[in-house]
């Protein structure tokens, strides 16, 4: 398939943005030699490839005219492959846009995802979900206002969207397991009887199950393995995950109940050096992860999952902050509970073999403190991680 070259686009905002009768694509990759935008039909067949322009300040860009919402796409990034230097570029891997707001297709575990010598040339596109271009979602918030309940008066109820609504006998059968079920009169009445002022939803961003679970015929029910930090999980939607999530928030707010999200920015599903290349590893491994100082082919494992997101790097930090702002401004959530929050405060010290020691003044904490979009939002930290120095209670 011959690549066409896209007209120049804008380097900001990152992700896919509809404007002027087309879509602007912007993707960060500091070490890439080339970036290719791959377009797919609804059956998962690749129909076009477009060469991106750049980089400009490490951002590759392009404008695809005469298209818009619903376009299905992924990226291929070519660059040096040298794990000993922390470089893992591989154009055989179709990569998910970290800024994807909706996904198409299901993730399937397959050896073509794995970063092994015997699978380097294997194409993984058939087993990857793709990003879907979304525009401005039309939704009537009907004057929605945050309840703004003081923390000292809050009664926070941790709940799994599917588990809670599946188990409640008065939630309509067709709504069980969904965002709409959480917004049903029966669910809200139950919460009100308990005196709940806020629901803390276990992870509702798109996630995948670990390979070891799949091999045992199981799944990661809880969702602590996030694949798309901007996309509401389709498992809990009937048709439109974005607007059904918004409807849930609006209804809960209408009854004085806040919505707090349990978020997992400390690691990704890409695991350790033997894990799959799905997005960040293939886009810019050195930027997104804490790597071993002694051997950058290995990852610093502060999370117990195989990798740790480097929130002190500006591009990883920008992704996290952009995601938080999206959920606050576009989805009207009232707060966040940060899983293994100590990881987000780990920074690399000069002349140290430790790639990340905890610092209470780390870039992530400073960024959150100064962001006006997050002012007044409830912020809850799990004050530890799985490594030395991480217990910060």
Predicted features along the sequence, with ranges:
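N-terminal structural segment of carbohydrate-active enzymes
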Residues: 1-235
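Beta-sheet entry/capping signal
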Residues: 24-26, 154-155, 197-200, 256-258, ...
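Proline-centered flexible-loop/turn and helix-kink motifs
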Residues: 30, 373-375
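Nucleotide-sugar donor-binding loop of glycosyltransferases
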Residues: 31, 263, 383
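Structural signature of outer-membrane beta-barrel domains
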Residues: 82, 343-345, 386
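Substrate-binding/active-site clefts of carbohydrate-active enzymes
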Residues: 160-332, 340-370
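Polar, glycine-rich mid-to-C-terminal structural blocks
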Residues: 352, 360, 365-369, 376-393
């Amino acid at each position: 398939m011959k690549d066409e070259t896209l007209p120049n686009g804008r380097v900001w905002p990152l992700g896919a943005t509809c404007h002027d009768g087309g879509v602007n694509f912007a993707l960060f990759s500091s070490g890439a030699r080339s970036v290719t935008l791959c377009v797919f039909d609804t059956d998962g067949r690749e129909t076009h490839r477009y060469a991106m322009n750049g980089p400009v300040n490490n951002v590759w860009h392009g404008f695809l005219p005469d298209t818009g919402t619903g376009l299905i796409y992924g990226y291929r990034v070519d660059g040096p492959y040298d794990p000993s230097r922390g470089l893992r570029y591989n154009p055989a891997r179709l990569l998910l846009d970290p800024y994807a707001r909706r996904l198409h297709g299901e993730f399937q575990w397959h050896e073509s995802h794995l970063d092994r010598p015997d699978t380097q040339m294997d194409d993984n596109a058939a087993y990857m979900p793709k990003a879907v271009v979304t525009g401005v979602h039309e939704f009537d918030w009907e004057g929605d206002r945050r309840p703004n309940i003081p923390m000292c008066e809050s009664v926070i109820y941790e709940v799994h969207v599917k588990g809670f609504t599946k188990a409640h006998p008065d939630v309509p059968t067709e709504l069980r397991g969904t965002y709409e079920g959480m917004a049903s009169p029966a669910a809200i009445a139950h919460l009100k009887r308990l005196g709940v002022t806020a629901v803390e939803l276990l992870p509702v961003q798109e996630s995948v199950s670990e390979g070891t679970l799949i091999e045992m015929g199981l799944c990661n029910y809880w969702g602590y393995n996030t694949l798309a930090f901007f996309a509401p999980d389709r498992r809990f939607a009937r048709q439109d995950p974005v607007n059904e999530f918004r409807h849930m928030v609006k209804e809960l707010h209408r009854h004085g109940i806040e919505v707090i999200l349990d978020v997992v920015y400390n690691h990704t599903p890409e695991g350790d050096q033997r894990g799959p290349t799905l997005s960040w590893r293939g886009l810019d491994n050195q930027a997104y992860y804490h790597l071993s100082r002694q051997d950058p082919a290995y990852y610093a494992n502060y999370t117990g999952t195989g990798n740790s997101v480097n929130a002190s790097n500006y591009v990883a930090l920008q992704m996290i902050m952009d995601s938080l702002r999206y959920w606050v401004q576009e989805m009207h959530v009232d707060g966040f509970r940060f899983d293994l929050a100590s990881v987000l405060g780990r920074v690399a010290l000069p002349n140290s073999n430790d790639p990340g020691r905890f610092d209470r003044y780390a870039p992530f904490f400073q960024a959150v403190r100064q962001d006006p979009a997050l002012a007044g939002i409830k912020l809850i930290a799990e004050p530890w991680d799985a490594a030395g120095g991480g217990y910060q209670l």
